[in-house]
Amino acid sequence: MTSRLSDPNSSARSDMSVPLYPTASPVSVEAYYSESEDEAANDFLVRMGRQQSVLRRRRRRTRCVGMVIACLLVAVLSGGFGALLMWLLR
């Protein structure tokens, strides 16, 4: 269902349509729940909680690895600049 702008003198184009209802976003296969399945609502919520925990742990692990790499990079660059400075001042 769409509504059309009826005022031909408006600054907007007259053939522009505006949806009355937002389009449905695609449902993730992992988050799909149906009453016809053998899974109870409580089991579904437990499964979703576990999936969210896994995603949270993965993000935390990725952030930690990134921080370690950044610290190592800063240490190597600092050591390189220190060695260059000592070589130039020798």
Swiss-Prot record:
Regions that span the bilayer: 68-88
Job of this protein: Essential for the anterograde spread of the infection throughout the host nervous system. Together with the gE/gI heterodimer, US9 is involved in the sorting and transport of viral structural components toward axon tips.
Topology in membrane: Single-pass type II membrane protein
Alphabetically ordered keywords of this record: Host cell membrane, Host endoplasmic reticulum, Host Golgi apparatus, Host membrane, Membrane, Phosphoprotein, Signal-anchor, Transmembrane, Transmembrane helix, Viral envelope protein, Virion
Residue ranges that the Swiss-Prot or TrEMBL entry lists as coiled coil: none
Compartment(s) where it occurs, according to its Swiss-Prot or TrEMBL record: Virion membrane; Host Golgi apparatus membrane; Host smooth endoplasmic reticulum membrane; Host cell membrane
Similarity field: Belongs to the alphaherpesvirinae envelope protein US9 family.
Pfam families tied to this protein: Herpes_US9
Intravirion membrane side: 1-67
Virion surface topological domain: 89-90
A GO BP annotation: intracellular transport of virus
Motif Internalization motif location, chain numbering: 21-24
Sequence segments annotated as region (Acidic): 30-39
Post-translational events: Phosphorylated on serines within the acidic cluster, possibly by host CK2. Phosphorylation determines whether endocytosed viral US9 traffics to the trans-Golgi network or recycles to the cell membrane.
UniProt xrefs under InterPro entries: Herpes_US9 (IPR009278)
Gene Ontology CC terms: host cell; host cell Golgi membrane; host cell plasma membrane; host cell smooth endoplasmic reticulum membrane; membrane; viral envelope; virion membrane
Name listed for the protein in its UniProt record: Envelope protein US9
Modified residues (Phosphoserine): S34, S36
